[in-house]
Every structure is written in structure tokens, then in C-alpha cells.
């Protein structure tokens, strides 16, 4: 058979002379003028690149920026030149070789504007992924060909499901020893419950990785020339034709199950065209009923250009995704409104602030425009505070570079300066429509540490750093504990808090000392407890009078991190204007329990009846009555302590399996699954966070430094009786008290 071979030269070699000029520029970035041109909505993609840590997200983004001409030179995450990847702009990111903050950029591929957000892979920075996915229309889920589906992959998958984000899967690192993309596909189906199939196959793995087979167009693609810029199309290798036919048939079967149009052709045994398959891939990907799986190795410059084609071909444009706002007016039911994604500016501007950052010119607020158009000089209103803001400057972002634009349209991601707001706020040009968008899910912190500046003279800088970081990151909390006279910071893990401590020293010249990590326990009721409390105080003049009757009860286990207040009063025994005072009192008292001093959670407060005085009743009196009622429930109710449970994943050589599982069991871990492949094993377990401190050094010593683990927050669960006794005892000792005479959970 005569082989028909042709070379596809991308536009990159044609730019070589231009790139030389670009390299001479101080910033090293190509001109952004052509990238900032406004495109029709069909020519826009907003995507995120998400994965488990060390799966190659940032390296992949670096290749995308290079192949699309956005940057002139590629740099590695841990390169010898110490420059670091473009999207890792923070010095700490370059030094550690990890992504800490999500970074935004935009580029062009085949006349389509692609807005990209590269997100962190470490579980401690999961809120960065959360708020990125909230504003994106599609995502690339990167999986390691060796590690497969790992703990943070599961988290990212849940986040994509929460915001209904369609995704492509890219199995990266085909060049690594032990890579097995077929095993990864199997894990996607079993662990992530994805209806997934290959649309590409690797031509060789590990050191034999030569190129890929495109199953849709039935051809082989080889990446040649400097940096793999030249694509050579060829016939599928002889030894892969049978496998390619089988995998293509498997792809069609999976697609037919998810797509009605293709399913009819399949049942009628009619021939499929390439256009039929591509159209079905796009429909099912947008509906999240099918996940196309692509393969490659970003580090070795293979598979990136076909991935860019797939982003354009299969992921939705902003007009194909339904985005909702809500009309909220007092005394009326909340109404749902579908926003208009057309880029014509006919409807009022609607945008969502999804990230805050302190820049050189003040606070930088990242927004996504969902409706209308916003121009320099316009006035916008914060839907939460109703404050007016005049737009003096509009920028689009390329990592840490800001590029000025005059206007943004629906579907664009941009930033503003000097806007006082919180993450998740809605902005609009028409405040009279009372519309707001759904905010961003923020997980509760699970670890606390004492923190103090090393030098007293640094207190001002310390305060500035804390104020900035708590505003930027909703999972980073700060408070002063009056009982132990300590300043505490809380976050998603030890690394999370260590990074902020290092940033305080680097960015504010304020070295700090962190104490030992403390677990964020919670207190909850075991069963319902009634209350009937009268607050009455008379000391001359108008007094205080408030009576409240009701019930406090536990919420279901899947809601045990929440607090719920329910007003069930009928009539005027408790006037409606005083009910907010009762709720305020309940929430204030929930900040510190009496068993261990930790917050209450998983509790519902039901206000059922009460009494008031025509003169002496006030909101303050009812707030104090709530304080008294909860103290009553503290004394009469049965309470228990909840602790955070972590999903732990350990990988090590199989000869250490017994030792690893033994150590997890000693730490009160419950083994939920094991896997083994080519001399290595992976064990999955649920372990209390309180028992995980110091595990890293134990794992290193027991596996000769070859084992590694990851963990992520799963849920809160009742702690063991001996742990509860220990926590209560430590709290009582810190308060200078004996054991409390309080009912605890009966075991």
C-alpha cells in the first residue's frame, strides 16, 4: 500500500522572525493586541485546567501558550534556568514547583479566543479550583498516565459536577516509566463514573512514545521539528490497525448510548461519517453525558495541538451554557432568570466577582461578564451592598501581566481595580432589577495554628498581611482566642498555613512563628432538647423582657457542618421585628460550645413560641434570651464532639504494604480499598485528621523514603469516646476547671 504522507506546518515557523523581535522585549510576551480583539460568541471558550497535584497542568498550559504564539519561549515548572512557568508568577510557586493561586490568561487558536485559568492541584488550595470552575464553561481534566485517578482528581470531579462544567480528559505523561493510559480510562469509568472512551490512542508509551492515533479522523499524528511544532499526518501504523478499529467501535458504542441521533444510526446499522461523530461528541460533551479522552505528553511536546482543536470542537461557547440569576425582593418568592449571553449589549451588564487579589495598584477583582457590555467610565452597583463603583480601568490578565482594554462583553473574563467587594458578589449596571447570581461554595477550615510575629516592631505589617490574605482567601480565617491569649489562623491544611506564613515574610518583611497544628473540632447535639427561657431585668427606667420557647435538635449527618434557624412562631407572642435578635443570639452562642470551646454545628434552632412586654421588650432582650436558652440546652442536652475525617491515599512499593496498612490502622484509619500494579500498591483509607499529624515522617521511615501520600477533607464524624474525653479534659485544664458535669454521648 502506498503511504500518503503530508506535513502540516503550523503558523508557528512563519512567526520565527517575529518571535526573535518579541524575545528582545523586556517583558518577553507577545503583543496582546490581536488576542484582545472581540470575537463573536461562537469563537470564545472559557476553560480551566484542573487535576491532582503533579499531573502536569502548568506544563500543559505553558505549551498551549507557546503553540498559540502567546509566549516566545517555554520554561519548565522546575527548569534548570530557574525562570519557572509563565503561569506560576509568584516567587514561592517557582521555588516550590507547585501552583498556589489560580492564574488567568487568554490566547488565540484558529481564530478562537480561549480564556484559560490554570488552577492548583494541592488539596489545601481547593478554593482556587472552586471559584475558577464557578465561572468557566468547560474544563480540561488532566490525569497522570502513571498515577491515574487520585484523591484530588475526585475532588475536582465533584466540583465540576457541582457547577455542571463539561470536560475533556487529557491523559498526560505518556513518556513516564510505568505509564498505562488504558488503566487510567478504566479508573475514570469506575471511580469517577464517567461514560468515557478514547478519541485518541498513543503510538507507544514510555521511551517509545512516538505520536498519537486520531480515532475520529482515522489517522496517525507525529510531532516533529523544534518543540514538536510540525504535525505530520500519516496512515495508522500496521500493528495498531486492529486495536484502532476496536477502540473506534467502542467509542461509537459509548457515544450511541449517550446521543439519540447517533444511537439511531447505530441501531439502523447505517455508516457513520466523521462529521456525525464530531457532532455527537460535541452534543454529549456539553450535556456531560460523555467524556472524550485524549492522550499526550506535554513535557515532550506531543498531543497539545490536537487538544487545542478538541477544546474548540467539543467544549461549549458561552452561548451554549445556561447561566442563571435570581430576583430577590422582600416578601416575595425568589425568581429564576436566564441571563442573555449575546454580545450585543442590549441587556444590563451582569458580572460575578470570583477572586480578589492585592495588586500593585490596589485591590484587583477578577470578574466574569455573564450579560451585556461594560465600558470604561460606566457605573456599576454591587447587588449585595448597593454601592456604586465608577470603572476607571478595565484589564485582561496574562498571568501577572495586566493588559488594558476599553470594553468587555458577555463571556469575557477581566479584572477591575479598587472595587470594595467580597468573593462571590454580583455586579450590575441596573440595581433596580434586584438580580444576583449564586455565590461560590466555600469549604470550612479544618486546621488551626497559633501565629505571632517574631519581632514586635512588625505588628503593623503583620496586621496588613492578615487583612489582605483573609480578604483574598475565604478559607483562610484569623481570630484572637481570649482564653489562651493567642492569635490563631485556620485553613485547609498545614501547607496552606505554611505558605501564608512564608508569604508574610517575603511580601511584608514580617517573619512569623507558627504553633503546632490544632484540629477544628465541632460540638453537636445527640438528640432534641426543649427550652423555655425567660429573660427579665428591671433596674430603673425601661427594663428588659423576653421569653422564648422552642426546641434545639441535631441535623442529619450529611448536614452536620451547618447551623439552621427556623421561625415557627404564629401570632404576635414573639413580634416579628424581634425574631432577628433571637437568631443573632443563637449564632453568637454557637461560636463556642461548653464541652470543648469549639463551634457548634449540625444543630437546628426552632423558635416555636414566647412572650413579650409592650414596653420592656426589645431586639437586645430577645438576643439575651437566646443566650440564656442555649446555656440551658448546654446543661440539659446530650452533646458530642465531631472531628474532620480525611480521605487518605498512600502509594508505595508493594513490599511495604503490610507496614503501611498497619500504621493507618493504628491511627484509627478505615481501609476503603487497595490497588496494585507493577510492584507498587495504592491504599485508600478514611482517617481522623487528629491522627494524621506526623504521618509524613513515619511513612518516609517505614518505606525507605519511597512512599508518598495525599489527603483531603471528607466530612465531620463523631470522634471516639476516648478522644472526646481527652479533648474535653484539655479544654477544662486550659480554663482552670475540673471535669464538666455535663451529659455526653452515651455509648
Curated annotation (Swiss-Prot):
Domain of life: Eukaryota
PROSITE patterns according to UniProt: G_TR_1, G_TR_2
Pfam family, one: EFG_C
Transit peptide: first to last position: 1-32
Pathway: Protein biosynthesis; polypeptide chain elongation
Function: Mitochondrial GTPase that catalyzes the GTP-dependent ribosomal translocation step during translation elongation. During this step, the ribosome changes from the pre-translocational (PRE) to the post-translocational (POST) state as the newly formed A-site-bound peptidyl-tRNA and P-site-bound deacylated tRNA move to the P and E sites, respectively. Catalyzes the coordinated movement of the two tRNA molecules, the mRNA and conformational changes in the ribosome.
Listed HAMAP family: EF_G_EF_2_B
Family note: Belongs to the TRAFAC class translation factor GTPase superfamily. Classic translation factor GTPase family. EF-G/EF-2 subfamily.
Protein name per UniProt: Elongation factor G, mitochondrial
Annotated organism of origin: Drosophila virilis
Taxonomic lineage of the native organism: Eukaryota, Metazoa, Ecdysozoa, Arthropoda, Hexapoda
Amino acid at each position: 500500500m502506498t503511504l500518503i504522507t503530508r506535513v502540516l506546518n503550523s503558523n508557528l515557523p512563519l512567526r520565527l522572525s517575529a518571535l526573535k523581535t518579541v524575545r528582545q522585549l523586556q517583558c518577553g510576551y507577545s503583543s496582546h493586541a490581536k488576542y484582545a480583539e472581540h470575537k463573536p460568541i461562537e469563537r470564545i471558550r472559557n476553560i480551566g485546567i484542573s487535576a491532582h497535584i503533579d499531573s502536569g497542568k502548568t506544563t500543559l498550559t505553558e505549551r498551549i501558550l507557546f503553540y498559540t504564539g502567546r509566549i516566545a519561549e517555554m520554561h519548565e515548572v522546575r527548569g534548570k534556568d530557574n525562570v519557572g512557568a509563565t503561569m506560576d508568577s509568584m516567587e514561592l510557586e517557582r521555588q516550590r514547583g507547585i501552583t498556589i493561586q489560580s492564574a488567568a490568561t487568554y490566547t488565540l487558536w484558529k481564530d478562537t479566543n480561549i480564556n484559560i485559568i490554570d488552577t492548583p492541584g494541592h488539596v489545601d488550595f481547593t478554593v482556587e479550583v472552586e471559584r475558577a470552575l464557578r465561572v468557566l464553561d468547560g474544563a480540561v481534566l488532566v490525569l497522570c498516565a502513571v498515577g491515574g485517578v487520585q484523591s484530588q482528581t475526585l475532588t475536582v470531579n465533584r466540583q465540576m459536577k457541582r457547577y455542571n462544567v463539561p470536560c475533556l480528559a487529557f491523559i498526560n505523561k505518556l513518556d513516564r516509566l510505568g505509564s498505562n493510559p488504558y488503566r487510567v480510562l478504566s479508573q475514570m469509568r469506575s471511580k469517577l463514573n464517567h461514560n468515557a472512551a478514547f478519541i485518541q490512542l498513543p503510538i507507544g508509551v514510555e521511551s517509545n512514545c512516538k505520536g498519537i492515533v486520531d480515532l475520529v479522523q482515522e489517522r496517525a499524528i507525529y510531532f516533529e521539528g523544534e518543540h514538536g511544532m510540525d504535525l505530520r499526518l500519516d496512515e495508522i501504523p500496521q500493528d495498531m490497525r486492529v486495536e484502532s478499529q476496536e477502540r473506534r467501535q467502542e467509542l461509537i458504542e459509548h457515544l450511541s448510548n449517550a446521543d439519540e441521533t447517533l444511537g439511531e444510526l447505530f441501531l439502523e446499522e447505517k455508516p457513520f461519517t466523521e462529521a456525525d461523530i464530531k457532532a455527537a461528541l460535541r452534543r454529549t460533551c456539553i450535556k456531560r453525558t460523555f467524556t472524550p479522552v485524549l492522550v499526550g505528553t506535554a513535557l515532550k511536546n506531543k498531543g497539545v495541538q490536537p487538544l487545542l482543536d478538541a477544546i474548540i470542537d467539543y467544549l461549549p461557547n458561552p452561548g451554549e451554557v445556561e447561566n442563571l440569576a435570581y430576583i430577590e425582593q422582600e416578601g416575595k418568592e425568589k425568581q429564576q432568570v436566564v441571563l442573555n449571553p449575546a454580545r450585543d449589549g442590549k441587556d444590563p451588564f451582569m458580572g460575578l466577582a470570583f477572586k480578589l487579589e492585592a495588586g500593585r495598584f490596589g485591590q484587583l477583582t477578577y470578574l466574569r461578564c455573564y450579560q451585556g457590555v461594560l465600558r470604561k467610565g460606566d457605573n456599576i452597583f454591587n447587588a449585595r451592598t448597593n454601592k456604586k463603583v465608577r470603572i476607571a480601568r478595565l484589564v485582561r490578565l496574562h498571568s501577572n501581566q495586566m493588559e488594558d482594554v476599553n470594553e468587555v462583553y458577555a463571556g469575557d473574563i477581566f479584572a477591575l481595580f479598587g472595587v470594595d467587594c467580597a468573593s462571590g458578589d454580583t455586579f450590575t449596571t441596573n440595581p433596580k432589577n434586584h438580580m444576583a447570581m449564586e455565590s461560590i461554595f466555600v469549604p470550612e477550615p479544618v486546621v488551626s495554628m497559633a501565629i505571632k510575629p517574631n519581632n514586635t516592631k512588625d505588628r503593623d505589617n503583620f496586621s496588613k498581611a492578615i487583612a489582605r490574605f483573609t480578604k483574598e482567601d475565604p478559607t483562610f480565617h484569623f481570630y484572637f482566642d481570649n482564653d489562651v491569649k493567642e492569635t490563631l489562623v485556620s485553613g485547609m491544611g498545614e501547607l496552606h498555613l505554611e505558605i501564608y506564613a512564608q508569604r508574610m515574610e517575603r511580601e511584608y518583611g514580617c517573619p512569623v512563628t507558627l504553633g503546632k497544628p490544632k484540629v477544628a473540632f465541632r460540638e453537636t447535639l445527640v438528640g432534641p432538647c426543649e427550652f423555655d427561657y425567660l429573660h427579665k431585668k428591671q433596674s430603673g427606667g425601661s427594663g428588659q423582657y423576653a421569653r422564648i420557647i422552642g426546641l434545639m435538635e441535631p441535623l442529619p449527618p450529611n448536614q452536620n457542618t451547618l447551623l439552621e434557624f427556623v421561625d415557627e412562631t404564629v401570632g404576635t407572642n414573639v413580634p416579628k421585628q424581634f425574631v432577628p435578635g433571637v437568631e443573632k443570639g443563637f449564632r453568637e452562642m454557637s461560636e463556642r460550645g461548653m464541652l470543648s470551646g469549639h463551634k457548634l454545628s449540625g444543630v437546628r434552632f426552632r423558635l416555636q413560641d414566647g412572650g413579650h412586654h409592650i414596653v420592656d421588650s426589645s431586639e437586645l432582650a430577645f438576643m439575651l434570651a437566646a443566650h440564656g436558652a442555649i446555656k440551658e440546652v448546654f446543661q440539659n442536652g446530650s452533646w458530642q464532639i465531631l472531628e474532620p475525617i480525611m480521605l487518605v491515599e498512600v502509594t508505595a512499593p508493594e513490599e511495604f504494604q503490610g507496614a503501611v496498612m498497619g500504621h493507618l490502622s493504628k491511627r484509627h484509619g478505615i481501609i476503603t480499598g487497595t490497588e496494585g500494579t507493577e510492584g507498587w500498591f495504592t491504599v485508600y483509607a478514611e482517617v481522623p485528621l487528629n491522627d494524621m499529624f506526623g504521618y509524613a515522617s513515619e511513612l518516609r521511615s517505614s518505606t525507605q523514603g519511597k512512599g508518598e501520600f495525599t489527603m483531603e477533607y471528607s466530612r465531620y464524624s463523631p470522634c471516639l469516646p476516648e478522644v472526646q474525653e481527652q479533648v474535653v479534659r484539655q479544654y477544662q485544664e486550659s480554663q482552670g476547671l475540673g471535669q464538666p458535669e455535663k451529659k455526653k454521648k452515651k455509648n
